[in-house]
């Protein structure tokens, strides 16, 4: 992602600019060299805030402090983003009842934590000839967790395994 470049002091190309003071007061439209002299007299920088406006808007401020605040804002935004993790639970078509309940409990925990869950059913040997056992097992898992989850991807075959992806229900 390219960082937006901000024109500062001599890098500003417009002849006339609208100037905003250090304390957010409007100083009006003035020639660039006059605005640069004003900023220099206050020992601050002239920063182009809105280059697309007519005339461009520039603000008298401490550019180093401005960059620091921008980086802090970016870090805060990154902190607030939620990262979705897909957890996986593997089953077999002949998985015993107690073991299946145990795996379903794992899927429930993943969903309650806010993560997605991938339920994979692995066929071995000749088990693949009886796919209905696998479909039944995945449907059982889906029916057990339908109160807290929604099926994002229906059961689908991929090689010797069948999988489905479930996600937490969106709270209204």
Curated annotation (Swiss-Prot):
Q: Which UniProt keywords apply?
A: Cytoplasm, Initiation factor, Protein biosynthesis
Q: Would the keyword Glycoprotein be found if you checked this record's keyword annotation?
A: no
The principal location of this protein is: cytoplasm
| Gene Ontology biological process terms in this record | ribosome disassembly
Q: Which InterPro entries match?
A: T_IF-3_C_sf, T_IF-3_N_sf, Translation_initiation_fac3_CS, Translation_initiation_fac_3, Translation_initiation_fac_3_C, Translation_initiation_fac_3_N
Coiled coil segments of this chain? none
As for subcellular location, the record says: Cytoplasm
Offer a single GO CC term for the protein.
membrane
Note one Pfam family from the annotation.
Answer: IF3_C
State whether keyword Cytoplasm applies. yes
Q: GO MF annotations for this entry?
A: ribosome binding; translation initiation factor activity
The entry's function note states:
IF-3 binds to the 30S ribosomal subunit and shifts the equilibrium between 70S ribosomes and their 50S and 30S subunits in favor of the free subunits, thus enhancing the availability of 30S subunits on which protein synthesis initiation begins.
NCBIfam families with a match to the protein in the record: infC (TIGR00168)
Family, similarity comment: Belongs to the IF-3 family.
Q: How does it assemble?
A: Monomer.
Q: What is this protein called?
A: Translation initiation factor IF-3
Per the UniProt record, the lineage of the source organism begins with: Bacteria, Pseudomonadati, Thermodesulfobacteriota, Desulfuromonadia, Geobacterales
Gene name for this UniProt entry: infC
